[in-house]
Amino acid sequence: MPVDFLTTEQTESYGRFTGEPDELQLARYFHLDEADKEFIGKSRGDHNRLGIALQIGCVRFLGTFLTDMNHIPSGVRHFTARQLGIRDITVLAEYGQRENTRREHAALIRQHYQYREFAWPWTFRLTRLLYTRSWISNERPGLLFDLATGWLMQHRIILPGATTLTRLISEVREKATLRLWNKLALIPSAEQRSQLEMLLGPTDCSRLSLLESLKKGPVTISGPAFNEAIERWKTLNDFGLHAENLSTLPAVRLKNLARYAGMTSVFNIARMSPQKRMAVLVAFVLAWETLALDDALDVLDAMLAVIIRDARKIGQKKRLRSLKDLDKSALALASACSYLLKEETPDESIRAEVFSYIPRQKLAEIITLVREIARPSDDNFHEEMVEQYGRVRRFLPHLLNTVKFSSAPAGVTTLNACDYLSREFSSRRQFFDDAPTEIISRSWKRLVINKEKHITRRGYTLCFLSKLQDSLRRRDVYVTGSNRWGDPRARLLQGADWQANRIKVYRSLGHPTDPQEAIKSLGHQLDSRYRQVAARLCENEAVELDVSGPKPRLTISPLASLDEPDSLKRLSKMISDLLPPVDLTELLLEINAHTGFADEFFHASEASARVDDLPVSISAVLMAEACNIGLEPLIRSNVPALTRHRLNWTKANYLRAETITSANARLVDFQATLPLAQIWGGGEVASADGMRFVTPVRTINAGPNRKYFGNNRGITWYNFVSDQYSGFHGIVIPGTLRDSIFVLEGLLEQETGLNPTEIMTDTAGASELVFGLFWLLGYQFSPRLADAGASVFWRMDHDADYGVLNDIARGQSDPRKIVLQWDEMIRTAGSLKLGKVQVSVLVRSLLKSERPSGLTQAIIEVGRINKTLYLLNYIDDDDYRRRILTQLNRGESRHAVARAICHGQKGEIRKRYTDGQEDQLGTLGLVTNAVVLWNTIYMQAALDHLRAQGETLNDEDIARLSPLCHGHINMLGHYSFTLAELVTKGHLRPLKEASEAENVA
């Protein structure tokens, strides 16, 4: 296994100084206390005392002794000499003239301070630590090198040579990898191994291997596509490998191995050693079995949605065609009924008078016509759905005979209907009179049960599918073995695991174990806030109480636009003029020189693999994906790092979700250290909003929305932006699903150093359930509601007098629901916090349209209280509303930069599968962050330059600057991956036309 995996930075910094230590480092590692001075004082001569003192500091700071004292920075030498009262540090030249002196001093320091050589048992302990980390995760060897270095220094082990450590890490990683391959290869029986080997051969009806065929998921939404998806899952399931055999194997490494199997070619797999080949095939089958089941159920859900949507379209067209007849009949009936209102007509004469106007037979025909074409208020075009039965019967047998559904208590009725249809659908019976009727709602009843009181085959089947879709989406019905459609409740903390972590979870979330204490605190907050806002309402010119409508409501005046002072305009202009022009290619390489983000990209299967100029290849691939232009414009046959083969190899082996996420975290964390970014915000506030992209290719991971996608389908990239303008997470959503399902996911799943505690969204992200979950998890939810004044304000004290707010505080909370479910609420929140279950999946299961569970009701009750607290703050505080608006505007402006970057192919995403979409949009977020970071660095340099020129800068103006500009960045045309030597060494490029800028100043 390759051992040359260290970056240049790691090689140069290992056991060496790379610059002057800062004041904190000097105080921590080079400060000499009285005991140190007593030990040092035993040496004779200033040169020996200074030399041994410096060696003490070096072994503390570097983990090793230096042989050449000239490599110690001047600041360290002076700092140490001052503590010893040595004025002339040139005496250090006399130190170590005898080689034995240095060796003797090193031995004395090791003995006195208990430093140890890198030998048994410490080699064994470090090897065990590295092996454990290598076994449970797929960490880069460079990261393990840093971990090992830190561990050695922590345990006062003198650092060995860099090659010794890299060789140990490579050997340990290889041993862990071989163990994984061996365990996986032993899972299948001899017969199963033979079947797995057949994956590499061609199928009967295609030149493609069976493995390549199974890699291809569904891309269309139709009955045949669903049947093919089910057959694909059955093929994988028939291998008989079971996921329970993997309980002792590391999930992360299995996932990476399976992903590698999905990316690499059959030719490469066939060339592997027998053990590795079998391990790769086993990992592929187990991972793709779950994926194939998820894909099939995704197609089912999308297909049912299409049936419902088509039924609605047909119904609306019918409605339009029948409106003329309905209007004519309605007018005739209105005229007939008007006779009933005539006071002068005796009751016994009314029928005769009506029939004189409209003959009895004609009136009966009109009534029949109205009943046929008029729709009840609860009609959801179910009649048109029944007409889709021909489409349904093409795929329903596959569904009923193949997929094994399970249910929670709320889904038992749906499961009973499913079991019934599984038995009876193959028959030719036209009536299912013995079918379970609990699923038949009032709106379906007239279409399922005919006039003769028979349950029709067509009506019952479509009624069941409608109920099945709703139950699946809410996970009342679920499929064991599926990742996306499984039971989220089974993943919550429970049993002994919950009891062991219960108190820790309560403490980490900041909630008391006694629900009465929590309710008392909430009640006090709500009561005091009501009274404070009521007392100031008459002075609040932006809010008025409107009692003219059926219900009192508040009218909130829109915020006035914030004027830009002349000083801000001038400052923005000066900074814009100073920003140097740059190609996006160079920008990426320069940001890598600052942050080393390219080091986070490692090979999917061989993490130690290194090639020359890899950052150049990675930057090219990132640009190809983010700009949506493909690799072709970036290929340079005369540049080894940019050849077609190199770029394709880099994209296949280095670009994936985990590496993109890690690289993005580096950029976000670097941005957080910049003084200018810290002026904009501390990283505690963020916003979430969606970017819409048309997907003109056939894919199941897209949805319709005429407003955003026209006649096409599309996806939403729901991304999260901090108050420092950095994007720290993104989620790909098919179509335009409710934002509220995903808003918490960005906070809980993000992997940067930021810790946002407050998030702003638009109205679509707001719901009482989300307010409740935010509070349980310790976050502040601050949406911009479209009509906050018309919202329901809730109270906990029924008899409290809130003065002018009494009329709007008309909702009465029920704390008893919270008390009953308090422990369950904390268990759910703790499971989310610990990553046991995905937020969006759990929220779907909680959002029940019918009969919400006690847990859901309790979370909603808490949400109502916290939503009311938010509303009271919102109407009372102009600055709060302004802060929300400002942060949301930052997100929208960042989208504009991302649009400018993603300019190729009309900005349309043409990836067919979810992984590809997520990788491409993750790359777009990464490159956008690189642009923001580059702008921030140079804006800081421009501000420093202006100050040096004597400009007086206003702090308020600086706080309103934005790095979301891109006019100076070339994203089109010639692409060159070269850096000036000055920038390569870590310096900034000169500001544009500095002399002219000085004249302006």
What are these regions (language model features)?
Residues 2-524:
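Long amphipathic alpha-helical coiled-coil/heptad-repeat bundle
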Residues 32-41, 601-617, 668, 741:
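Short linear interaction motifs
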Residues 56, 159, 194-198, 205-208, ...:
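Contiguous, well-ordered alpha-helical segments that form the cores/surfaces of helical PPI scaffolds
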Residues 63, 634-635, 686-692, 759-764:
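Short, conserved catalytic/metal-binding motifs centered on acidic residues
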Residues 528-637:
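Structured, charged N-terminal subsegments at the starts of enzyme catalytic cores
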Residues 590, 594, 598-600, 610, ...:
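Active-site cores of enzymes that catalyze phosphoryl transfer or operate on phosphate-rich substrates
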Residues 635-674, 705-823:
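Catalytic or ion-translocation cores adjacent to nucleophile or general acid/base/metal-coordination motifs
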Residues 807-1001:
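Long, compositionally biased intrinsically disordered regions
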